[in-house]
Amino acid sequence: MTRMAEKPISPTKTRTRFEDIQAHYDVSDDFFALFQDPTRTYSCAYFEPPELTLEEAQYAKVDLNLDKLDLKPGMTLLDIGCGWGTTMRRAVERFDVNVIGLTLSKNQHARCEQVLASIDTNRSRQVLLQGWEDFAEPVDRIVSIEAFEHFGHENYDDFFKRCFNIMPADGRMTVQSSVSYHPYEMAARGKKLSFETARFIKFIVTEIFPGGRLPSTEMMVEHGEKAGFTVPEPLSLRPHYIKTLRIWGDTLQSNKDKAIEVTSEEVYNRYMKYLRGCEHYFTDEMLDCSLVTYLKPGAAA
């Protein structure tokens, strides 16, 4: 496998990204537990078949990503933005692989270490408190589930180049991300960016995901192809995110008193606005969620 030379990164930029991530994910583990399922998975679930519980659908989503990677025992899987560790645990248990997780959240890092330590395996398991910009070790496969929203448009070329260079000739990667549409695309579908929509987007990127910026599916494809990947047709998960958000919102609402107790009424109201608002805009086809697969030449052949 080819190793990529380390690329210097601004200390200010790194510090800012740490602050942005921790502003959201380090609110309180107890708070997130009030609306997440037992897997502690904070991304779009996959309700296939439709009668799955949220927990079952979260495992189905993880499996949907992992099954696209052609994992073999002994391979090393890199999980960029590894959350609370469910994807890594699933990969070790299903495919007998080594795992490396990257996170910028101190709370997630601590929980991941506990999750990985509890797995009965001789495979290597590690979680690093760092971003992808500072990672250059060779790996066989890469998965990234809803971390891409935090990377920034200006960093997409560097991200895909780095991922391409640290994998072998048959490398595979999946990236799942919430996505938005270009105004021209919305106009073609009879939609337009209203003041209300713009205000909600501003709320999301300032109060919920500071520093976040949604890509379009086209951007995810084009930047991946520019780096040398072959990109099959992306998969839209929009109906599944609508259901996920509805369940999260209903569950948090049913735990209102506990949520206020572990955080504050202001935090509770902010997250209810976020969950209900996102459900609305996904339903209204203003937002989508794309699962994109990236194949190096040896995998695409």
Curated annotation (Swiss-Prot):
Function: Involved in the biosynthesis of hydroxymycolate, a common precursor of oxygenated mycolic acids (methoxy-mycolate and keto-mycolate). Probably transfers a methyl group from the S-adenosylmethionine (SAM) cofactor and, subsequently or simultaneously, a water molecule onto the double bound of ethylene substrates, leading to the formation of the hydroxylated product at the distal position. Involved in the activation of the antitubercular drug thiacetazone (TAC).
Species, as recorded: Mycobacterium tuberculosis (strain ATCC 25618 / H37Rv)
Keywords from the UniProt entry: Lipid biosynthesis, Lipid metabolism, Methyltransferase, S-adenosyl-L-methionine, Transferase
Gene3D superfamilies found in the cross-reference section: Vaccinia Virus protein VP39
The protein's enzyme class: transferase
Classification via InterPro entries: CFA/CMAS (IPR050723), CMAS (IPR003333), CMAS_actinobact (IPR047672), SAM-dependent_MTases_sf (IPR029063)
Regulation: Inhibited by S-adenosyl-N-decyl-aminoethyl (SADAE).
NCBIfam families named among the record's database cross-references: mycolic_MTase
Pfam families tied to this protein: CMAS
Catalytic activity, EC: 2.1.1.-
PANTHER family associated with the record: CYCLOPROPANE-FATTY-ACYL-PHOSPHOLIPID SYNTHASE
Other comment: Susceptibility of M.tuberculosis to the second-line antitubercular drug thiacetazone (TAC) requires primary activation by the monooxygenase, EthA, but is not sufficient to hit the lethal target. TAC must be secondarily modified (methylation) to its lethal form which causes growth arrest. MmaA4 activates TAC by interacting directly with TAC or with EthA to produce lethal TAC, but the methylation of the drug appears independent of MmaA4.
Protein family according to the UniProt entry: Belongs to the CFA/CMAS family.
Positions annotated to bind S-adenosyl-L-methionine: 42-43, 81-83, 103-108, 132-133, 145
Phenotype of the disrupted gene, per the record: Cells lacking this gene result in a decreased permeability and fluidity of the cell envelope due to a drastic difference in the mycolates pattern. The parent strain makes three types of mycolates (alpha-mycolate, methoxymycolates and ketomycolates), but the mutant contains most exclusively alpha-mycolates. The mutated strain grows more slowly in the lungs, spleen and liver of mouse and is cleared more rapidly from the liver than the wild-type strain.
Name assigned to this protein: Hydroxymycolate synthase MmaA4
GO molecular function: cyclopropane-fatty-acyl-phospholipid synthase activity; methyltransferase activity; S-adenosylmethionine-dependent methyltransferase activity
Top-level taxon in the UniProt lineage: Bacteria
Active site per database record: 278
Transmembrane segments: none
Subunit structure, interactors included: Monomer.
Keyword Transcription found: no
One Gene Ontology cellular component annotation held by this UniProt entry: plasma membrane
Pathway: Lipid metabolism; mycolic acid biosynthesis
GO BP term, pick one: methylation
